[in-house]
């Protein structure tokens, strides 16, 4: 994941030619001389770092939200010439999000709004252009900046929201695999990890009169797919028997890597394409429900406030947003994404850390049968029927 870089020089000038700020942790830049510095967690009083130094940088190891206190002394002095506690109220703060992901940003963004409300700061968020289009009108108190542009701002503090692997607890206070990847944003920012969908424009008029269900069958790794060879065909057939049109809304009708490719299910209507996210929301908003994977379009459906049938074994049931229509099979190997013994390999499309190359590869979703998913759909359909919510 790539993020905006902090300013080359800290943004606040102190006495004695010293500069400091809180961009990607506490940062202090000293001129020539003999100095002593303390970096303190103000909430606990713990001294996180204390050292003598000459000209150069002192930076905190921890980059997530900590209420830092910085004390800087001329070496030998008892009284600091700089003694400041980080205070974000009315200060310019940047939250930098990575690009190239859909579900991650949908999952994380409302934590930024919680942060703004908590601290009453002047918040700026760096996201890709497609998310500026999707979100900016619904968050008028946040300034949006394109992550693709060169950044020349001078914020007081910067935070980076992402997934940090290999047990990294410098950029996140806890390993994201222990708390669910979306809640990780709450922990990084020091706000409640309770999940909340972002605010979207849900005002589009309905264009398809018949009841319909949206599905999405593609994802970024084969482990995230539903690897039951007959599953999607059974689900599409069953949905049509219930009277729904079935619209496949993946970006691509066919996607894969090397010798493994996944295709739009037989019988589904092809609504695939690289469409603006708002157009996807406009279609999802009026669907009776969505059936998908541990992938970005499931998150977009959740944010569109419709029921989501989520099929996954690669991740554990609390790894994504809560849905009563989660489909998970505990009878085989499962949950490798959330297992701290394994580090996900983004370069290996066929990553399966325990059973790759054996007949048990991807059994986490292969053992989820069409019967099991159709059973969940039957329960959801009955609920919608009984509450007069078939739309």
UniProtKB/Swiss-Prot annotation:
EC identifiers of the protein: 2.4.99.-
Cofactor: Fe(3+)
Reactions it catalyzes: ADP-D-glycero-beta-D-manno-heptose + L-seryl-[protein] = O-(D-glycero-alpha-D-manno-heptosyl)-L-seryl-[protein] + ADP + H(+); ADP-L-glycero-beta-D-manno-heptose + L-seryl-[protein] = O-(L-glycero-alpha-D-manno-heptosyl)-L-seryl-[protein] + ADP + H(+)
Enzyme class, UniProt record, top EC level: transferase
Effect upon mutating residue 364 to S: Loss of iron binding. Loss of catalytic activity
Domain of life: Bacteria
Co-factor remark: Binds 1 Fe(3+) cation per subunit.
Effect of residue 220 to A: Loss of AIDA-I heptosylation and loss of bacteria adhesion to mammalian cells; in an aah2 deficient background
Effect on the protein upon substituting residue 352 to S: Loss of iron binding. Loss of catalytic activity
Catalytic residue positions: 104 (proton acceptor)
Family: Belongs to the glycosyltransferase 9 family.
Subunit architecture: Homododecamer composed of 6 homodimers forming a ring.
Protein name: Autotransporter heptosyltransferase Aah
Species of the source: Escherichia coli
Gene behind this protein: aah
């Amino acid at each position: 994941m790539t993020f905006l870089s902090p300013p080359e020089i800290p943004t606040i000038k102190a006495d004695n030619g010293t500069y400091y700020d809180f961009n990607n942790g506490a940062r202090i830049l000293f001129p020539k001389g003999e100095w002593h510095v303390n970096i303190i967690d103000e909430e606990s009083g713990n001294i996180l770092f204390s050292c003598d130094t000459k000209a150069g940088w002192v930076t905190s190891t921890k980059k997530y939200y900590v209420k830092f206190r910085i004390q800087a002394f001329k070496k030998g002095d008892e009284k600091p010439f700089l003694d400041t506690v980080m205070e974000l109220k009315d200060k310019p703060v940047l939250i930098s999000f990575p690009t190239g992901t859909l579900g991650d940003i949908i999952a994380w963004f409302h934590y930024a709004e919680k942060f703004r409300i908590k601290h009453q700061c002047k918040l700026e968020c760096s996201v890709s252009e497609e998310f500026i289009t999707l979100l900016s009108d619904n968050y008028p108190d946040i300034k949006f900046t394109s992550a693709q542009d060169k950044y020349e701002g001078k914020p007081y503090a910067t935070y980076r929201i992402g997934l940090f692997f290999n047990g990294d607890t410098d950029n996140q206070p806890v390993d994201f695999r222990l708390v669910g990847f979306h809640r990780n944003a709450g922990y990084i920012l020091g706000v409640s990890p309770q999940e909340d969908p972002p605010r979207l424009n849900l005002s589009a008029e309905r264009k398809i009169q018949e009841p319909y269900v949206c599905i999405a069958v593609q994802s970024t790794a084969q482990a995230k797919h539903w690897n039951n060879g007959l599953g999607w065909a059974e689900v599409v057939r069953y949905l049509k028997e219930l009277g729904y049109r079935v619209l496949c809304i993946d970006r691509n009708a066919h996607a894969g890597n090397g010798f493994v490719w996944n295709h739009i299910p037989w019988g589904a209507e092809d609504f695939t394409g690289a469409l603006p996210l708002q157009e996807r929301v406009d279609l999802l908003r009026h669907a009776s429900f969505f059936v998908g994977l541990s992938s970005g379009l499931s998150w977009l459906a959740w944010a569109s406030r419709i029921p989501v049938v989520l099929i996954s074994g690669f991740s554990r049931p609390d790894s994504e947003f809560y849905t009563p229509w989660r489909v998970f099979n505990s009878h085989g190997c499962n949950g490798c994404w959330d297992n701290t013994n394994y580090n996900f390999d983004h370069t290996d499309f066929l990553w399966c850390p325990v059973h790759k190359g054996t007949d048990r590869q991807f059994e986490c979703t292969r053992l989820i049968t069409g019967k099991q998913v159709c059973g969940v759909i039957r329960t959801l359909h009955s609920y919608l029927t009984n509450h007069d919510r078939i739309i």
